[in-house]
Structures are given as C-alpha cells and as structure tokens.
Amino acid sequence: DPKGKTDAEVMRFCQSFMTELQKYIGPSLDVPAGDIGVGGREIGYLYGQYKRLNQFDAGVLTGKPLGFGGSLIRPEATGYGLVYYTEEMLKANGNSFAGKKVVISGSGNVAQYALQKATELGATVISVSDSNGYVIDENGIDFDLLTDVKEKRRARLTEYAAEKPTATYYEGSVWTYAGNYDIALPCATPVSYTHLTLPTKRIV
C-alpha cells in the first residue's frame, strides 16, 4: 500500500520486488502491466531495476513513461475511451455530453481523464471521490487542481476541497449524493452503486 510512503520508500520496494520478479518475466514469458496503485512512477522504478539487472529491457513491462519507450496517451486511454464510448451511445439516442451534469466516482487515472474529456465535450463534472469520501462542486471539478492534489502531492480530496471555495467534501460514497445529475461514470473500484442506491438516476 503506497499511501503515506515517500518516493524513496516506494522506489526501494519496487526495486526489491523486481529483483525477485525478474527471474519469471520477459518478452517470451510474461509481461506485467500497471494496475490500481501501480502507475507510471512505479512502472518506471520496476523497469529501471529490470534493466539494471539484465542489461536488456525490450518488451518486459507495459505502461512505461514515454521517456522509457511507453505509448503516447496510454495514461489517458481508459478515461478517454469511457467518455468516447458513452458519447457514441448518447449520439445513437439523439443526445450528447453537451450541457449535461456528470457524477464521477474515483479520482485516479481513469477518473481524471474521464473528467477532462467529458468537460471538453461540454459537460459539467460535479464530483470525484476517494476511499474516504467525495467532493461536490456544482461549478465543475477543476482538472488542473485535481491532478496537482492527486498526482503531485498524492494527497486526499479534503485538500482539494480546502483549496476550492465552491467545493464541499462529504464522507461516504458518492453514490449516496441526492442532488440532480444526468450521467454517472463509475471510475473507481469497488463499484458501489446499485439500483437501490440510485433509484432515480440515469446510469450510462
């Protein structure tokens, strides 16, 4: 669990882990990828240790930063894809994101880029969440502030709310929010909504 750990602590853990893992991975064996809690920073540390130990790096990890041969817009791909897919469903019904109010769960990679793309398409995203609670901002979540808080400072959403005068932080699940919105985009795990928690909402 990387919460509360320094970059140096995370790096040492990743290096120790790769020292053992490197015996079992490779282009013709297994190619690990990032997942929840394992982003570009962690993949970079793992990649560096593998290369140091083997003097070879081709095809051994996916999700590397661009500087290490990673793919362009890989970090954005899932969040963008969710919004593009949803936009096509809306178009098929004569609708679009434009003018819609959107609730997003999560505040990690997928949530951040779903927020960015939905906003670009004309929606107002009013929420993001983490494991402790959620933020509601009827004026729209600030993408730049969110990424600064979550990616650079690696802080909680309480810090976001403290810096955004129009934002309010609530404890609990975002799916208990009783306000009005048009589209729900679940971008966190576990998915904590059901037909009981959202009886009157349109889930796309």
Identify the meaning behind each predicted range.
Residues 76, 80-169:
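Glycine-rich phosphate/diphosphate-binding loop of Rossmann-like nucleotide-binding domains
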